[in-house]
Amino acid sequence: MAEPGRPWAQARSAYRASEVLRRGTGRRRDPGPQSNGPGQEDARAPGRMARLRGQLRAEAASRSEVPRLLKLVERAGAGAAGRGREDRRAQPRAPCARYAGSPAAGPPTRRGSWRSASGGCRRAWRQCARSWAPGLRRCARSFERSWMPCARCCRRRRPRLPAASPAPSPAPRPAARPCRGRSAPLAPWSPPPGPQTTPRTAQQNAERTEPRPGRTTRRCQCRLGPRKVAGTEGGRTRAA
């Protein structure tokens, strides 16, 4: 739909140019001798880009945006046809447009393309920092020139503050209240009467681990390891 205040013909021309940029299809290459394919004469015929260029020139010959539209179409044709390796090497490389796997980052080194791309990024960053430094210095100088007079004026016109008074002395602590309980001092702690629980000695531990008289030290049969069974008598196993 055309924008308000814009002729429909201009919108149509711009739409066609944007379609060319979006699709990115250029002149078809020569398919070679084929039985059912197009022949040599069809391959030499003007391609789609040439026909579109002619239509744009014919439709927008009297409008002011003709050079811009033609430039868009030429750019689309160049991007669709693709540039050769020599053209890519000859064109100036954008310092901030390098990334891994891009032909603009240069040929990969023996250690891998990632190392080459990271080196290109570092060089691009240094170049950008060098280009930013003069502008930053100029901005700092202009800011200093505009700010320093204002600071001096404010320093001269600021009101005189009274001298700082000394810090107040802390309030005296209240006197300790007399004890309201019994006046006699508390007796020192003494252990309660009765047998005292002291830690067991090594001898007591040894006596505790010895078997008590009248009891067997034989462990439960279920806790014994596997034994060799020679036979079964009456449902009970007999050791060999």
Swiss-Prot record:
Annotated region Disordered: the residues are 1-117, 161-240
Bias (Basic and acidic residues) occurs at 19-31, 60-74
Q: What is this protein called?
A: Protein FAM246C
- Which family, according to UniProt? Belongs to the FAM246 family.
What ranges does the record list as Low complexity composition bias? 176-187
Residues annotated as transmembrane: none
Q: Output compositional bias ranges, type Pro residues.
A: 165-175
